[in-house]
Design a protein with these regions (language model features):
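Nucleotidyl polymerases of mobile genetic elements and RNA viruses
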Residues: 1-446, 452, 456
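Short, intrinsically disordered, charge-balanced linker/junction segments flanking boundaries
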Residues: 458-464
């Protein structure tokens, strides 16, 4: 049954659903067939030929989803106390931009460092099929180590262990698969259980850092040392570029792989080194990890590097991304209402994530406004159309005669000001500690200036 069925006929089935959910949670016994799940294979590429080119999505029973969602909502409330501050995925009051700012600030430090006998490096890890490889015994034990009660552990493991799968082939379920490992994409509880699994890796790295065996990187003398950052399955590790620390990091990863079932994808793992490191050292560390060496800032959490020399390239990439979408719309007959929705929901929404982290060049904002303006007035290729109203007028509210389109420059500054406000209002966060130590150690955050050798992240926040 679809969710719409339960919503429409809740007056008739609501009490039965509530009783089923409560009985399952109280007895800790899953009714037979309630956790039967269909797997829908979504192609990752245009013409898939291998099974690895499909993304499996679990289609769970609706009543099971209610049970799982109840547990997920309860778990969500205590994640802030359980998950370490280096991990920001799915944790209330933490955002993906926290990791972005700290990572780019730390990479800026690596890129600008000129002194010191030993260099620094960043290791960007890529784990393959993280959900599918989680060992149930590890999940149960890490949950117990984090202090959860046995009743809670039995409830979560009930959800994990009672599942069975059938694969949808041409819309029909085929076969019956009984798994022994893994979590399922589509289960509301899975992202939070994976956070608990990843906390094991974070704890091992923290233990090495506290013991002084992995030094980590500090953006300045007063700032805390950052040994690693986690966002779901995305992990970045910072340490000295020596074989000694490299071996210790590799030892932690090997132990984590053996315990949790995770597998490091060495082909997609990358290393970024401090400039003055010798080629010999780079090759030794590269051989240890079996990873590739990158020469500039790596893309992190979907954001390209915004360094001075690469800013034009990034601007061109964003413009092309929006431009390709608009070109696809121009060949279709779209009403003015449809054009309005496409501009607001797609063309002007596409760069929002990047605008939340970086100040985009004004020329790029003007180019994006130009693309949206031309699409609004129906301009195709080189055939110019008359713009009967200025773009500035269209960006005003509808009550004032405009269309409510965004002024991208003002929107960019507003998003960055919001990030500055978050840093100011969360004095106990890791993000605040890093920026406070580097840019406003002797003054309040509101009085902070650019300072010496600021990163582009800080320049963007100050500009707002």
């Amino acid at each position: 049954m679809s969710p719409i069925f339960y919503q429409k006929y809740w007056d008739f089935v609501g009490s039965s659903v509530i009783n089923c959910v409560m009985n399952t949670l109280n007895s800790r016994r899953m009714p037979l067939g309630l956790n039967d799940t269909y797997i829908c294979l979504i192609p990752k590429v245009k013409c898939p030929k291998k099974i690895s080119e499909f993304r499996p999505i679990s289609l769970c029973n609706i009543i099971y989803k209610v049970i799982s969602k109840v547990l997920a909502n309860r778990l969500k409330k205590i994640l802030l106390e359980v998950i370490s501050e280096e991990h920001s995925a799915f944790v209330p009051r933490r955002q993906i931009t926290d990791n972005v700012f700290i990572a780019f600030e730390t990479m800026h430090r690596i890129n600008q460092k000129r002194d010191g006998k030993e260099g620094l490096m960043a290791i960007k890890l890529d784990m393959s099929k993280v959900y599918d490889r989680v060992k149930w015994a590890y999940l149960e034990e890490i949950t117990r180590k984090l202090g959860f009660q046995e009743r809670w552990i039995s409830l979560t493991m009930m959800c994990v262990k009672t599942v069975s799968f059938s694969v949808l082939i041409n819309g029909e379920p085929k076969g019956r698969i009984i798994p022994t490992i893994g979590l399922w994409q589509g289960d509301p509880l899975s992202p939070y259980l994976f956070l608990l699994c990843a906390e094991g890796l974070s704890a091992m790295l923290q233990r090495e850092a506290y013991a002084g065996r992995i030094e980590g990187i500090s953006v300045c003398r007063e700032a805390p040392y950052i040994s690693h950052l986690l966002f779901a399955d995305d992990c970045m590790i910072f340490c000295k570029a020596t074989m000694e620390e490299g071996n210790r990091v590799m030892g932690v990863l090997n132990n984590y792989e053996a315990a949790s079932g995770q597998n490091l994808n060495k082909e997609k793992t990358s290393l970024f080194f401090f400039k003055n490191i010798s080629r010999e050292t780079k090759e030794k560390v590269k051989g240890l990890f079996g990873a590739q060496i990158i020469q500039q800032h790596e893309t992190y959490l979907g954001l390209p590097p915004l360094v001075v020399r690469g800013r034009k390239k990034v601007s061109s990439r964003v413009k092309d991304q929006v431009g390709r979408k608009i070109i696809g719309w121009k060949g279709k007959l779209i009403s003015n209402a449809g054009r309005e929705i496409l501009i607001k929901a797609v063309a002007q929404a596409t760069p929002t994530y990047m605008m939340s982290c970086f100040l985009l060049p004004e020329s790029l904002c003007n180019d994006l406004n130009s693309l949206a303006r031309n699409f609004w007035w129906g301009q195709k290729e080189n055939k110019r159309k008359v713009a009967w109203v200025s773009w500035e007028k269209l960006c005003t509210r509808k009550s004032e005669g405009g269309m409510g389109f965004k002024d991208l420059r003002a929107f960019n500054l507003a998003l960055l000001a919001k990030q500055g406000w978050r840093i100011l209002r969360k004095p106990n966060s890791l993000l605040h500690s890093v920026f406070k130590a580097k840019y406003s150690a002797m003054v309040s955050f509101m009085e902070a200036q650019l300072g010496r050798n600021p990163s582009y992240v800080w320049r963007s926040i100050v500009a707002a």
